Swiss-Prot record:
GO terms for biological process: maturation of SSU-rRNA from tricistronic rRNA transcript (SSU-rRNA, 5.8S rRNA, LSU-rRNA); translation. This is Small ribosomal subunit protein eS8. GO terms for molecular function: structural constituent of ribosome. The lineage of its organism: Eukaryota, Discoba, Euglenozoa, Kinetoplastea, Metakinetoplastina. GO terms for cellular component: cytoplasm; cytosolic small ribosomal subunit; nucleolus. InterPro entries: Ribosomal_eS8, Ribosomal_eS8_CS, Ribosomal_protein_eS8_euk, Ribosomal_Se8/biogenesis_NSA2. The gene is RPS8A.
Length: 220
């Protein structure tokens, strides 16, 4: 059977040793951790107690991520694992676990933002180091250019709607900068080894500032 969660081999509080009077049971079976890595999707079903099935993700490259303050969610590409409070080894091996911090593709959120508010974040972007480096290396693909939404082709009715929406709207500067760069920090809230998915939320507010400081400190 291999790994077991049996109590038979444990010592008692008094120091005595339990006498093993029976064989190990299937219910006591333990399994190796999934260690879900970043890569082309590969999942496998695992039969659990009661005939139920867990979905064990071995490789994942996409997930559903929510932008909580805007009440939207998009399926986006996972780009990198950038921080894990538990272990730097999990960052080095790009292992996806619950509560790890990942960088996700900003394109779907940027496109939604342009369609919903009529604001093209690329039009007035400052030449940040990351953006300049990306342009120099020619990373901007034809696919990304095709996905871009043209805010200048909107109807008068839609422009009036945009004006109404922008009246009391304000986006956090740190998030806007990330959207311009094309990479947004997010936290995984699902359990890839149990549900077979890597879903999560974008970092905002104090949480985002905390992890930005951590990453800056890590670089030094």
């Amino acid at each position: 059977m291999g790994i077991v969660r049996s109590r038979l081999h444990k010592r008692k509080i008094t120091g005595g040793k339990t006498k093993i009077h029976r064989k190990r049971m299937k219910a006591e079976l333990g399994r190796l951790p999934a260690n879900t890595r970043l890569g082309a999707r590969r999942v496998s079903p695992v039969r659990a107690r009661g005939g139920n099935f867990k979905i064990r993700a071995l490789r994942l490259d996409t997930g559903n991520f929510a932008w909580a303050s805007e009440a939207i969610a998009h399926r986006v590409r996972l780009l990198d694992v950038v921080y894990n409070a538990t272990s730097n080894e999990l960052v080095r091996t790009k292992t996806l676990v619950k509560n790890c911090i990942v960088a996700v593709d900003a394109a779907p959120f940027k496109r939604w933002y342009a369609k919903h508010y009529g604001i093209d974040l690329d039009a007035d972007k400052k030449s940040t180091k990351a953006a300049v480096a990306a342009e120099k290396k020619g990373r901007k693909s034809a696919h990304a250019a095709a996905d871009k939404y043209d805010v200048n082709k909107a109807s008068p009715k839609l422009q009036r709607e945009w004006t109404r929406r922008r009246r009391n709207h304000r986006v956090e500067k740190a998030i806007a900068d990330q959207l311009r760069e094309g990479r947004v920090l997010a936290r995984i809230t699902s359990r890839p080894g149990q549900s077979g998915r890597a879903d999560g939320i974008l970092l905002e507010g104090a949480e985002l500032q905390f992890y930005l400081k951590r990453l800056e400190k890590k670089k030094k």
